[in-house]
Amino acid sequence: MNTLGCFLRLTTFGESHGDMIGGVLDGMPSGIKIDYALLENEMKRRQGGRNVFITPRKEDDKVEITSGVFEDFSTGTPIGFLIHNQRARSKDYDNIKNLFRPSHADFTYFHKYGIRDFRGGGRSSARESAIRVAAGAFAKMLLREIGIVCESGIIEIGGIEAKNYDFNHALKSEIFALDKEQEEAQKTAIQNAIKNHDSIGGVALIRARSVKRNQKLPIGLGQGLYAKLDAKIAEAMMGLNGVKAVEIGKGVESSLLKGSEYNDLMDQKGFLSNRSGGVLGGMSNGEEIIVRVHFKPTPSIFQPQQTIDINNHECECLLKGRHDPCIAIRGSVVCESLLSLVLADMVLLNLTSKIEYLKTIYNEN
């Protein structure tokens, strides 16, 4: 499937080395002011070629809006948008056109569809994630209207873990590091991987909070059973290239605790802790939503590796091209966009949860 969302639905199309990639975002309400500066900034955050820690491939990533916007406001109809691919180098893949790159999707895509699109991974390339970032920018415009903001950064690279989380620092950091004190060690780990023609894994932290620090998030976003908020968040994150695990709140650590250690106690002002990561029973509880996303090392490394070709013959694979040494870095921006899309979707879906909401809409005139 190529569509994400229940009410606010994003459908994407295109390949890494095709003429363009694009998306259709259906379900956006009318009357939302389109913030072109925000859209451009989001695309630049994900953009390659900015420093030595990410891919050298630098696309312009100019978003061309083709529908759903009139005089700088959303019209309520599907928002269509395109991003042209201008700096693809398909010749870098000529030597592996009949090979399966280890730990890439080449093998599974070929056996499922019978087509070997070797040009940068085709549809399975992380290039497609640029569309998710563009769509996430539109979702952020919606969330801003009701006081919700999403933020992200890197908390771990190669086992070097952040001790403190500073989202303002992450915005200025070359690797979106949340901890200034650990940043240099994390950078060194990436540089060592590059020197060894290797790659390295990492963990991104994404959170949603109220724009106003003294206010809570809306309570009740998400459904109790088959559209749980945490399930939809995990689904969106796991649909991103290279993601191998998603944690909400304490996540895996929860399985090591007793109930007396894990439970979030309450007083008249609210919760006294947030080990649940802002989600209870599949719905937001008003606290910050905390998500950790674990990325595997980039499978594209510049070392000789054993593999097979499309005829099942054993051979050696030696890659060329331009690749991220740590996909978690730019991946953190995509995860932030995905959380924005999921929350915007749940906000719109929540309008049907009480008859009072519908009466407010339809009886106001």
Swiss-Prot record:
It is an enzyme of class 4 (lyase). One of its GO terms (molecular function) is chorismate synthase activity. It catalyses: 5-O-(1-carboxyvinyl)-3-phosphoshikimate = chorismate + phosphate. FMN binds at residues 123-125, 241-242, 281, 296-300, 322. Signal peptide: none annotated. Its EC number is 4.2.3.5. Coiled coil: none annotated. NADP(+) binds at residue 46. Reduced FMN (FMNH(2)). Keywords: Amino-acid biosynthesis, Aromatic amino acid biosynthesis, FAD, Flavoprotein, FMN, Lyase, NADP. Its cofactor is FMNH2. Pathway: Metabolic intermediate biosynthesis; chorismate biosynthesis; chorismate from D-erythrose 4-phosphate and phosphoenolpyruvate: step 7/7. One of its GO terms (cellular component) is cytosol. GO terms for biological process: amino acid biosynthetic process; aromatic amino acid family biosynthetic process; chorismate biosynthetic process. Belongs to the chorismate synthase family. Homotetramer. This reaction introduces a second double bond into the aromatic ring system. This is Chorismate synthase. The lineage of its organism: Bacteria, Pseudomonadati, Campylobacterota, Epsilonproteobacteria, Campylobacterales.
